[in-house]
């Protein structure tokens, strides 16, 4: 693991992907379940102060998320634009806490993930790709129902920033490798939107290979590792009951 990059990040720091995921996790823990108003409040807090990130300011945020967060309120948290530019991969990068909190109920995980995605990304493609991603991540495998969604061109060295390309590219990195580490290295070394494709790949590969497959040398460098693990455990406990 190395630092640097366009934001000169230290080893183990996270970008907007991680910050928004932590903001969602905090809302679930505080409210003991899905609370879009609390998630909106946390997003706005992060946008203003950098809280939930690794610094006391926001050093990385996409235009779609930034515009939506500025527009959303706790009374109306669903502020995602609906134009063709609002089909970015930022809607997938932050969903791990929702799947942890609903690990016994895929339909609930899908519904809540779609809702949180629509808070910042309102394009019509978001719903089907979010449902596909959550379903296949929680099952730990590709399914024939979503085969067509993975046929987006992934041969280019750079990703496009769209949800379509990120979803296909992440699965490609998992399918063409045989370990968590190799999948992540393949994904992030494509460059361009490496943090987001890496985050999406990490969820898929994490489900496939398990926590024990994450290299210890990576975990040792992770900023606030103990706090993140504690949050993950609290989220997992929220999903103790099966679907009703």
Regions found by a protein language model. Give the residues of each.
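Structured, active/binding-site neighborhoods that engage oxygen-rich ligands
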Residues: 1-244
């Amino acid at each position: 693991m190395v630092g640097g990059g366009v934001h000169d990040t230290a080893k183990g720091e996270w970008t907007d992907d991680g910050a928004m995921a932590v903001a969602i996790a905090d809302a679930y823990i505080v409210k003991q379940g899905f609370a879009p108003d609390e998630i909106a409040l946390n997003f706005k807090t992060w946008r203003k102060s950098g809280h939930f990130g690794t610094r006391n300011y926001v050093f990385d945020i996409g235009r779609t998320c930034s515009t939506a967060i500025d527009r959303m309120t706790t009374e109306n948290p669903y502020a995602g634009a609906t134009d063709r530019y609002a089909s970015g991969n930022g809607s997938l990068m932050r969903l791990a806490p929702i799947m942890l909190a609903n690990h016994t109920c895929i339909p609930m995980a899908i519904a809540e993930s779609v809702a949180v995605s629509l808070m910042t990304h309102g394009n019509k493609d978001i719903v089907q790709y979010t449902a596909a991603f959550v379903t296949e991540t929680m099952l730990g495998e590709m399914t024939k129902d979503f085969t067509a969604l993975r046929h987006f061109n992934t041969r280019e060295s750079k990703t496009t920033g769209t949800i379509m390309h990120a979803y296909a590219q992440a699965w490609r990195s998992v399918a063409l490798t045989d370990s968590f580490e190799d999948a992540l290295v393949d994904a992030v070394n494509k460059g361009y939107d490496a943090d987001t494709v890496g985050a999406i790949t990490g969820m898929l590969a994490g489900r496939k290979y398990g926590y024990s497959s994450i290299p210890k040398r990576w975990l040792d460098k992770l900023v606030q590792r103990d706090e993140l693990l504690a949050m993950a455990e609290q989220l997992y406990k929220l999903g103790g009951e099966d679907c009703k």
